[in-house]
């Protein structure tokens, strides 16, 4: 479903081989958070998605672990920013901001995080909407 949806919206998208169940379980183990259902579902079909310019719209399972743990452990980040422990960063824009899942009272939501201000703003509530905005509206859609 995800591969077809992505290629329908953005034929130039670069899709990877799927992530396996062992890999997804390792992501949850390392991050100590469950993967949102729709993100896990996408990763089961393609382990990451890039646009034609190489921007990682959705990170691979490996990058999910590496980047999230690095952000949580970076001493400077611990002083400068509110904690990231309840967030799962999963994508970025060539303009600097990164996107993360957070849990809201209504379920998971996707926020954009601005590293300059530590502002975290809910931008969409579904991965489908996030992908549509990234691929159809371009890199500045979240502004």
Language model features with spans:
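A short, sequence-level motif marking secondary-structure junctions
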Residues: 104-107, 127-129
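Short conserved micro-motifs at the rims of enzyme active sites and ligand-binding pockets
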Residues: 100-103, 122-124
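Short, flexible beta-strand-to-coil junctions
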Residues: 91-95, 104-105, 115-117
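A surface-exposed partner-binding patch
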Residues: 1-100, 141-143
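Compact, glycine/acidic-enriched structural inserts
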Residues: 117-142
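Long, low-complexity acidic/proline-rich regions
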Residues: 108-109, 120
